[in-house]
């Protein structure tokens, strides 16, 4: 058991070593850390009530300057302040939604792959039904039924991603369920639930970690898209998609109102994709070839 533990530790140490050698992945990680720090300390940088949501029509649509680094929007609110508070919303929704998807999808996929037979067929047919519907349409349908709010937004996005993680975990489980350490656990009388939770799921984490990173990027993009059409975070709360939607009518003569929220979305998605690609290469170097 001790040898197995040490082997796993050395494997993860090798993964981190390879990740550090990937410059693009490290760039993505650094950008992501900066975004997270800005989101965490947003209240210290810009007061929410007096700067982020309070209107100041005397300074509406001001271009970038020393006073307002990224300019102001149609209500005179500082765009930089709203962007960093919006980062908190986007990252929170993206990370929590994908975390829920990983847990639910992982359990369903592990049960399906481990037991097989009728259980596998039943779970996979339900998964196929959900996969037949585009994830953004499924999210729109759920939010439309439940109403726009942050909680409902997270629920809708997490439900739309559960089938993806269920299939990924199932595929991993099918490749390891007949290996010697699983048979050894069965031989000593370990219960099915213990085998799934202690042996199956931990050994299926590599593809889940990669897909989870890319999934957060997709969830942030879905959040922005739903907010853009009025089904996500509601004004005056800052959210990148709603900022894009509110500023599109001023694009011709106040380009900064929509440009900077768009750039924030692009940078965040790019950093997550770079990190996800780096994790994929580190966890399975064969995929690089």
Predicted regions and their residues:
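Signature of the 12-TM Major Facilitator Superfamily
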Residues: 26-30, 122, 193, 197, ...
């Amino acid at each position: 058991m001790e040898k197995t533990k040490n082997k796993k530790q050395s494997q993860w140490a090798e993964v981190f070593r390879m990740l550090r050698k990937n410059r693009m992945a490290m760039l993505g990680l650094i950008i992501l850390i900066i975004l997270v720090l800005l989101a965490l300390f947003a209240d210290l940088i810009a007061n929410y009530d007096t700067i982020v949501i309070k209107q100041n029509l005397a300074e509406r649509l001001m271009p970038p300057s020393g006073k307002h680094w990224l300019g102001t929007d149609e209500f005179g609110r500082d765009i930089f302040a709203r962007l960093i508070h919006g980062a908190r919303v986007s990252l929170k929704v993206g990370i929590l939604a994908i975390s829920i998807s990983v847990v639910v999808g992982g359990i369903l996929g592990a049960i399906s792959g481990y037991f097989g037979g009728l259980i596998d067929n039943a779970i996979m047919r339900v998964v196929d039904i959900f996969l037949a519907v585009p994830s953004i349409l499924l999210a729109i349908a759920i939010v439309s039924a439940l109403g726009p709010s942050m909680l409902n937004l997270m629920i809708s996005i997490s439900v739309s991603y559960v089938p993806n993680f269920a299939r990924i975990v199932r595929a991993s489980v099918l490749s390891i369920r007949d290996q010697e350490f699983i048979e050894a656990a069965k031989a000593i009388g370990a219960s099915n639930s213990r085998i799934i939770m202690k042996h199956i799921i931990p050994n299926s984490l590599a593809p889940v970690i990669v897909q989870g990173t890319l999934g957060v990027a997709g969830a942030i993009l879905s959040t922005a898209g739903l907010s853009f059409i009025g089904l996500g975070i509601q004004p005056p709360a800052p959210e990148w998609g709603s900022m894009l939607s509110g500023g599109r009518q001023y694009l011709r003569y106040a380009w900064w109102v929509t440009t900077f929220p768009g750039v924030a979305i692009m940078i965040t998605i790019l950093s997550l994709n770079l990190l996800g690609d780096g994790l994929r290469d580190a966890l399975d170097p064969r995929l690089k070839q």
